[in-house]
Amino acid sequence: MASNERDAISWYQKKIGAYDQQIWEKSIEQTQIKGFKNKPKKMGHIKPDLIDVDLIRGSTFAKAKPEIPWTSLTRKGLVRVVFFPLFSSWWIQVTSLRIFVWLLLLYLMQVTAVVLYLLMPIVSASEVLGPLCLMLLMGTVHCQIVSTQITRPSGNNGNRRRRKLRKTVNGDGSRDNGNNSPDKVRAVETLESASSVGGFWGTLFGNRIKRVKLVSNKGTETDNDSGCFHPILKKRQGRPEIRMWQAREKAKVSDGEKCRREAYRRLGNGISDDLSSEEDGEARTQMILLRRSVEGASSDNGYEVKNRRSILSRHLNSQVKKTTRWCHIVRDSDSLAESEFESAVFSQGSRSGMSGGSRSLNLSRRDSESTRHDSETEDMLWDDLLHGPECRSSVTSDSEGAHVNTIHSGTKRDPKEDVFQQNHLFWLQNSSPASERVSAIIWEGNECKKMDMSVLEISGIIMSRVNAYEQGVGYQMLGNAVTVGLALFPFLYRLFREKSFDQLKSISAEEVLTLFCGAPPVTPVVILSIINFIERLCLTWMFFFMMCVAERTYKQRFLFAKLFSHITSARKARKYEIPHFRLKKVENIKIWLSLRSYLKRRGPQRSVDVVVSSVFLLTLSIAFICCAQVLQGHKTFLNDAYNWEFLIWETALLLFLLRLASLGSETNKKYSNVSILLTEQINLYLKMEKKPNKKEQLTLVNNVLKLSTKLLKELDTPFRLYGLTMNPLIYNITRVVILSAVSGVISDLLGFNIRLWKIKS
């Protein structure tokens, strides 16, 4: 229905727009209809030394986002909570078995409490409805948090980000080994979460370990030594380039042929510098063909296949040395660092193009190439941090048709969208900031040493300092105290309302039980009261636990910003044991901006924002209810127990929101501290005075600093708590309603009119 309305609107829009057109507009439309397919084109590439505004804004380091609207997520969350046992597999997938059992017990107790209350409506309704509302709220919040995993294809494991591909690949009669029999290969990839990762690489690249296994038809299982098996290459198993890899594994060809078939062309970086001028034309053709294979071109004829095979056979030797260097890194890494290197290096199959058995290559150039190893490894690790997981998870096999049979365990994605993400990954690889280094100063005791460091290395040191910081437990204790108080509140309210201090000294156990139940202590009422107490205790603790997680995340963001602001200060950098460098070169400014954007995007983002948004909306809702109750009758407002409970909730939530608002504001100030750039400009002028011969170069850097200052002022916005700010309409409506209600309450209490918000006409 909605699509028909949109079509009708578009039709009528074009219809009435035709009456406004002149000859020039009609001719332009005809030109646009013809398109640009017939225009001459030539090869181009992205300038790797330039930056985009996305890098300054931070959108270069994209985070996972749900593809389902928030209304659908809210509806699904409510359904999954109401019919909790029916979605047991989903809850186990997104939590764990133990947590699911615990939640199932709470769900069954809540259902029992509702049934008992409907049979005997003796106790207060707020004691039953309070835990029920908390359960619905937290279930909806959790559904929105894990929504990025819901939209992606996943198996039984909730943490798995890749598809399980079951492929049937037919042999090619024109292959060199002459193997014409059909061949089936099943590739199963699993992701495991490491329990604890320490050190620089652990804090920088997360807790992911990748293992790849190849299972043949005979039931034997062979481990891929190097594991360089990219999902895009798996997707193209049926193509001649990938069949070469299968031929080597099964026919056991000679070592010389293995070396020739080990490496594939690297995509996204243009033509290798090692190629001679006579081979440039063929190398370009090879790059175009391989890129087409990655982007999903599935209409290759036999002639094109032959051309690909011949071109590959001519130039594979020139890539053996590069493959050797990558395999070197994998072999020489240690323990957990090795697995982290493998996870990052193997994920770059579309760029490095290594084949599965490349560990058998000659590794004789190890010492002379060690410096280049580090820089190339950082390039790939940086690219993996940018959009690697998203692009890997978006691989589909819609274009393979007869070659590949894929088991889709999730929703289908548009192949054009996948191609766009893959091309976007190539752009990021070409403009990787990790390839550039800055001469930084580090302190080892009382000694000051210089060291060339990249963005990854500097950020890794900063994150290790933040992880070593001892977090406070003040807000955890506050949450626990509020949890116990809210769980015991109905009993304490009845106790102090019906008994005086003198009567409390001689109170009996039967009277305590009666006050605890709020009714004569018969068996169903006692069971209902115990269930309500357990529900209130557990669910309230879970809610404040989520708030403590949000507070911890905001604290870590503040520490990231604090240490980042100390990088250009020699005294502060030495105090906190972080690298120090000055913005005396244009390259240093570029790295400083890249580091700033990278640190701003590190850690949980959307998931924590969902929690804060929900808390913000809950606080505003409670405030609106309290204002309405006061307007209805401020003299009898405190006579009801649920109004007291609302006030306790509002006070606790406001304390947490005040903490989050202060941390967020301080974090924003640290990142938007223009005084750092102004100080560096003063340092440049001081340097000009001492070195007049470098005045032109220093003036250039000074101009770049001025532009950076203007750009940061243009892009940075004041900090706002997530919630209503995400929807301007709801934000404005709520601001008017809440402030108008508060104005009415204050005016009623004080006796004269006070207008906190004026609606402008």
Curated annotation (Swiss-Prot):
It comes from the Eukaryota. Coiled coil: none annotated. Its main location: endoplasmic reticulum. Residues 170-181, 347-363 have a biased composition (Low complexity). The modification Phosphoserine is found at residues 272, 276-277, 333, 335. Glycans are attached at residues 179, 224, 362, 430, 673, 732. InterPro entries: PHTF1/2 (IPR039775), PHTF1/2_N (IPR021980). Residues 364-375 have a biased composition (Basic and acidic residues). It is found in: Endoplasmic reticulum membrane; Golgi apparatus, cis-Golgi network membrane. Residues 6-150 form the PHTF domain. The chain crosses the membrane at residues 77-97, 99-119, 121-141, 472-492, 514-534, 610-630, 644-664, 736-756. Keywords: Endoplasmic reticulum, Glycoprotein, Golgi apparatus, Membrane, Phosphoprotein, Transmembrane, Transmembrane helix. It comes from Mus musculus. One of its GO terms (cellular component) is endoplasmic reticulum membrane. Interacts with FEM1B. This is Protein PHTF1. It is a multi-pass membrane protein. Widely expressed with highest levels in testis. Residues 152-184, 345-414 are annotated as: Disordered.
